[in-house]
């Protein structure tokens, strides 16, 4: 896997999120609420999906008070019951693999909008399974290097049960099996680590480059349109963007 590309994708998403915190908080809040309603209740100790999303929310700087309020509200009656999770797969320009995870209360609206974005920017929406085989689901934890000792961090990660560890220029990237994510997260948090990003993600086996600037611009516009859509929670892809190097 290309960890360098992974971190660059995260940096781009976080830089974009800094300019749209309200929308990011709303999307994560919806995920939290649905996890409580549909995933096993408000206790993260017995709801592994909720535990994962709390980690994601904290890494995105969602205030603890907001997280607690969302969970408490979702434990009662609410609109989260109306949402369903739908994943779309397709191809961007030049065959870039794209996975789009959504939470929607109107699947026809969401499907139409997602299809429109693919068509508009030189891609096409595919069938279920058409690109997901190119990805592996992994827990991904990103820690800024700062003054941390690489050998010590690697030792702590392996002791915690991480499957892979990589040192990038600015960060340490820690990969886990999905089932081990919560345990590794808890262990490293207890040791004082703070995370730039913490989430179970779809990580591509390989990354692909685009042939020219015009194609890259279309790909970026496709990603922006998808990520800006209120129903879209996550967008995973295997484009290696040289502008992020």
Question: Where are these predicted regions, by residue range?
Answer:
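Positively charged, low-complexity, intrinsically disordered RNA-binding extensions
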Residues: 140-245
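N-terminal cationic and glycine-rich segments that engage phosphates or anionic surfaces
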Residues: 1-126, 131, 136-140, 237
């Amino acid at each position: 896997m290309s960890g360098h590309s992974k971190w660059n994708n995260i940096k781009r998403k976080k830089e974009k999120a800094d300019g749209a915190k309200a929308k990011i908080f709303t999307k994560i809040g919806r995920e939290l609420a649905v996890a409580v309603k549909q995933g096993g209740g408000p206790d993260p100790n017995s709801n592994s999906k909720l535990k994962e999303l709390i980690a994601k929310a904290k890494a995105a700087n969602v205030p603890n008070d907001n997280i607690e309020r969302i969970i408490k509200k979702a434990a009662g009656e609410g609109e989260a019951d109306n949402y369903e999770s739908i994943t779309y797969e397709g191809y961007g320009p030049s065959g870039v693999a794209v996975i789009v995870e959504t939470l929607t209360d109107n699947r026809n609206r969401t499907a139409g909008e997602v299809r429109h974005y693919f068509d508009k920017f030189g891609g096409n929406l595919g069938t279920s399974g058409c690109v997901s085989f190119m990805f592996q689901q992994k827990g991904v934890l990103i820690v800024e290097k700062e003054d941390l000792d690489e050998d010590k961090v690697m030792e702590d990660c392996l002791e915690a049960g991480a499957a892979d560890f990589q040192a990038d220029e600015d960060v340490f990237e820690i990969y886990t099996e999905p089932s081990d994510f919560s345990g590794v997260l808890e262990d490293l948090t207890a040791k004082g680590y703070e995370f730039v990003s913490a989430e179970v993600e779809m990580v591509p086996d390989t990354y692909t480059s685009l042939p020219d600037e015009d194609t890259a611009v279309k790909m970026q516009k496709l990603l922006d349109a998808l990520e800006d859509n209120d129903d879209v929670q996550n967008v995973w892809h295997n484009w290696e963007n040289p502008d992020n190097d």
